[in-house]
Each structure stands twice: as structure tokens, then as C-alpha cells.
Curated annotation (Swiss-Prot):
Protein name in UniProt: 3-isopropylmalate dehydratase small subunit
Membership in a protein family: Belongs to the LeuD family. LeuD type 1 subfamily.
Species of provenance: Corynebacterium glutamicum (strain ATCC 13032 / DSM 20300 / JCM 1318 / BCRC 11384 / CCUG 27702 / LMG 3730 / NBRC 12168 / NCIMB 10025 / NRRL B-2784 / 534)
Gene: leuD
GO molecular function: 3-isopropylmalate dehydratase activity
Organism taxonomic ancestry: Bacteria, Bacillati, Actinomycetota, Actinomycetes, Mycobacteriales
Subunit and partners: Heterodimer of LeuC and LeuD.
Length: 197
């Protein structure tokens, strides 16, 4: 997993609340057996049926920092929702409230979910409306987002923050203990069952 310390990308204002995982990626797109290629399903109902949807505009179609309304990622636990956002190009999502499971899935996959006050979310929306294509700089170490001269703080779970800054997914966490695992396996009695790769 790629380390996340600072990142700059075009901010995308998603001025909708209660965006659930089925709206992020409908179930029809969940039949794939790979972990990539889900970007075509991202917000597909809105992208296909609303020509004015934010990701259908030239200004925001290549955005990578999503600023969403409250209660983002609610609904069923669907890792595909995180994968779709990441496959599209998003590195960070900010909201005043996230579903806990969505936040956990995001952190494990390498995407930052930062919590801001709703008034700060609305300030970012206003700034992005005034300056379409505004770049947002996310500093995970300092837990701030910079938009022009405006600096806004955000919260993130300390453990997820550490994992993102270290670039550690679940496999990476296990590999940090590889010496101890190999030492244990070497000392384990030969008559006990083993799994071979």
C-alpha cells in the first residue's frame, strides 16, 4: 500500500447527505472477482441519469479529494464502495459523519476518511463553487486541509492515520512480523500440522 503523508488534488463537492454504499456502487457491479476495475460503477445511477452530476462536469471529472455531506458510506458493508472510489482516483474523502464500517474499510484499503465540522465542509463547498477546480492539499501528519489561504483541521482514527502514513495494509502488518513468524515455524515440532504455500 502506498504511504499517505501529504496529497494535493482537485476537490469535488458532493453536496448530498446520506450517501449509502448502494449509491456509491450499485450491487450489479459487485459480480467481479478482481479487486480493481470498479470505477465504472462509481455513482453510476447519478452519472448515467443526471447530466449535471458533479463528476459529469469537466471541472471535476478528474477530481481526487471528495468533500461529501453527512452520513457518507452508510448501508451495507461493501468494500467495493471504497475500491470504486479509489479506482476512480479518489485518495481522500471528507465528511462530518461516516459509517463506521465504511471508515474501517477505507483505512484498510489506503483511502483517507477525514471527519470535519459540517460548517467546514460547507466552507469548502463554497470555496470550490467560487473557484471551480480548486486544489486541496491534505496533510495527514498535521491533520489539516489547505484550500488557498484557508486551513481546516480534520479528525482521523489514530491507528488508521498511523497505517496510512506507514503504508501498511493487513498483509504489510503481517510482514512486519516475518522474522518472528519464521522463528516460530522453525521451532515448531515437526509432528504438528503445517500449511505449505
Amino acid at each position: 500500500m502506498e504511504k499517505f503523508t501529504t496529497y494535493t488534488g482537485v476537490g469535488v463537492p458532493l453536496q448530498r447527505s446520506n450517501v449509502d454504499t448502494d449509491q456509491i456502487i450499485p450491487a450489479v457491479y459487485l459480480k467481479r472477482v478482481t479487486r480493481t476495475g470498479f470505477e465504472d460503477g462509481l455513482f453510476s445511477n447519478w452519472r448515467q441519469n443526471d447530466p449535471n452530476f458533479v463528476l459529469n462536469t469537466d471541472t471535476y471529472k478528474n477530481g481526487s479529494v471528495l468533500v461529501a455531506g453527512p452520513d457518507f458510506g452508510t448501508g451495507s458493508s461493501r468494500e467495493h464502495a471504497v475500491w470504486a472510489l479509489m479506482d476512480y482516483g479518489f485518495r481522500a474523502v471528507f465528511s462530518s459523519r461516516f459509517a463506521d464500517i465504511f471508515r474501517g474499510n477505507s483505512g484498510k484499503a489506503g483511502m483517507l476518511t477525514g471527519i470535519m465540522e459540517q460548517s467546514d465542509i460547507e466552507l469548502l463547498w463554497k470555496l470550490m463553487e467560487q473557484t471551480p477546480g480548486l486544489e486541496l492539499t491534505v496533510n495527514l501528519e498535521k491533520q489539516i486541509v489547505t484550500a488557498g489561504d484557508v486551513v481546516i483541521s480534520f479528525e482521523v482514527d489514530p491507528y488508521i492515520r498511523w497505517r496510512l502514513m506507514e503504508g501498511l495494509d493487513d498483509a504489510g502488518l503481517t510482514l512486519r512480523k516475518l522474522d518472528e513468524i519464521e522463528d516460530y515455524e522453525a521451532k515448531r515440532p515437526a509432528f504438528k500440522p503445517r500449511t505449505n504455500a
